[in-house]
A protein has these predicted regions:
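A short helix->beta-strand "capping" segment at the edge of beta-propeller domains
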Residues: 2-18
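Beta-propeller fold detector
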Residues: 8-12, 58-64, 116-123, 170-186, ...
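Beta-rich, blade/repeat-based domains predominating
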Residues: 16-31, 35-38, 44-45, 65-85, ...
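Short loop/turn segments immediately following the C-termini of beta-strands
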Residues: 37-39, 90-92, 100, 143-146, ...
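A short loop-to-beta-strand structural motif that recurs across blades of beta-propeller domains
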Residues: 45-49, 103-106, 158-160, 215-217
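Short loop/turn segments immediately following beta-strands, especially the blade-tip
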Residues: 108-113, 162-172, 219-226
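Histidine/lysine/aspartate-rich catalytic loop segments that bind and position anionic ligands
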Residues: 142-189
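C-terminal closing repeat unit and adjoining cap/tail of repeat-based domains
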Residues: 217-242
């Protein structure tokens, strides 16, 4: 196994209408789809970019906005086997009061590469971020769950699990949420920002990045999808930078 550092090089430069690149996913045809929430320039509508294997860049579509706020904030992306695209819409990232607890998980359905239908899988989320699909389930990180109080006073974040065909699940961002799979505490008081990236290995173990702690947690589940362990799998506190 090659453990040596690999050389990186610039693949593409993005146009001005994508000042904030974020989540990525490979489309069924092999193109790279890139979410651009565009927090760095809110005059630019949040969009999805299409990047071909040879580096051709184009705008695919503007992400459907939430009527109450007038914007979208796409971050994590994941395709299912049918080619539907699931998006974590992190409305609350802006800090605007009208966007508080207005995050969504969206399902975009397509016909001939054109957006046909937008389905709201879940709404009312505080800080939805990463998203992955496994065995018909959606796993979504929430980087902040401020309504769940730990005795330490430190930040709680978590992972939610939805059925891929769910619609209009009302999330409360509390421990009463039936879709809340597991939670973690971010122990670094200088960076109170929780779970972010998310991925499965072939064995079905779920790995999530705890941003503030610079740690990766491994979450193991039983055959019914219940969490049996949630432990820090990798961390080097000497590498933390604020």
């Amino acid at each position: 196994e090659n453990t040596l550092p690999q050389k990186s090089e610039l693949f593409v430069s993005l146009p001005d209408y994508c000042p904030t690149p974020d989540g990525m996913a490979i489309a069924p045809n092999g193109d790279l789809i890139l979410a651009c929430p565009n927090f760095a320039d809110i005059t630019q509508p949040a969009c999805l970019m299409r990047i071909t294997k040879d580096g051709a860049v184009s705008k695919w579509l503007d992400v459907p906005v939430l009527e109450e706020t007038g914007w979208a904030s796409p971050m994590g992306l994941a395709f299912n086997e049918e080619g539907d695209l699931f998006i974590s819409d992190n409305q609350g990232w802006s800090g605007a009061e009208k966007a508080k607890n207005k995050g969504r998980v969206l399902r975009l359905k397509f016909e001939n590469d054109q957006l046909k239908e937008t389905i709201t899988v879940a709404s009312g989320m505080e800080h939805p971020n990463g998203i992955r699909i496994r065995n018909g389930k959606l796993y979504v990180t929430q980087s902040s769950l401020s309504q769940i109080k730990d005795p330490s006073g430190l930040l709680v974040s978590g992972v939610y699990c939805f059925d891929m065909n769910d619609r209009d699940i009302a999330v409360t961002n509390t421990s009463a949420d039936q879709n809340l799979l597991t939670t973690v505490i971010t122990k670094n008081p200088e960076v109170q920002y929780g779970l972010d990236g998310i991925v499965f290995n072939e064995a079905g173990d779920l790995f999530v990045g705890n941003f503030g702690d610079g740690a990766i947690h491994r979450i193991k589940m039983d055959a019914e999808g219940k969490v049996v362990s949630n432990d820090v799998w990798a961390q080097d506190t000497t590498q933390l930078r604020t």
